[in-house]
């Protein structure tokens, strides 16, 4: 969890403007570096009393790549290295679970040779919280915090995209927009 996770939804028939649901996990940005990384935290389960709440999403894992060179050739479109957190499932008439946080990716590569026809996407995004999708629903799940991508030797300069984004919180009470 590079950044904090999002808070859960307002809850059943709550008109308060602020969240009254579960709190998101703490961000670990001050503690993450090439020699200290963390798995993404799992999301909390939704509150339920009607047996239709959903579980929280799994957190992203840890990927460590050590290589002299990474090369792509040909027309592959895109290759992906992913430690994304899992989205939470949508809930019925109970609370939706929170999403998993993105994990950590450490890449120690001396040389990059990435073809424009075979780009690389490196991502450690938080998952999206579940939606409470009935009018009497309790509350949406919080979004997962962003993960971390660390290039500890040479960072790629072309044809590589790096993503570390927070996940979105789920909608409350079937609201639109959230």
Stretch-by-stretch model annotation:
Residues 1-106, 121-150, 166-178:
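Glycine-centric low-complexity/flexibility signal
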Residues 161-163:
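Acidic, glycine/polar-enriched metal-coordinating patches/loops
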Residues 69-71, 111-114, 154-158:
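Acidic glycine-/aspartate-rich tracts in secreted/extracellular proteins
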């Amino acid at each position: 969890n590079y950044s904090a996770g999002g808070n859960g939804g307002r809850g059943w028939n709550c008109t308060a403007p602020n969240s009254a649901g579960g709190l998101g996990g703490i961000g670990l940005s001050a503690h993450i570096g090439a020699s200290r990384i963390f798995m993404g935290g799992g999301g909390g389960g939704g509150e339920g009393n009607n047996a239709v709440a959903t579980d929280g999403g799994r957190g992203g894992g840890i990927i460590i790549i050590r290589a002299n060179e990474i090369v792509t050739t040909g027309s592959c479109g895109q290759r992906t290295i992913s430690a994304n957190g899992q989205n939470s499932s949508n809930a019925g008439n109970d609370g939706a679970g929170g999403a998993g946080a993105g994990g950590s990716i450490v890449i120690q590569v001396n040389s990059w040779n990435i073809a424009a026809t075979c780009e690389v996407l490196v991502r450690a995004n938080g998952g999206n919280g579940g939606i409470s999708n009935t009018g009497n629903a309790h509350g949406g799940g919080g979004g997962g915090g962003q993960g971390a991508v660390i290039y500890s030797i040479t960072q790629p300069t072309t044809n590589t995209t790096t993503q570390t984004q927070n996940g979105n919180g789920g909608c409350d009470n079937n609201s639109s927009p959230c």
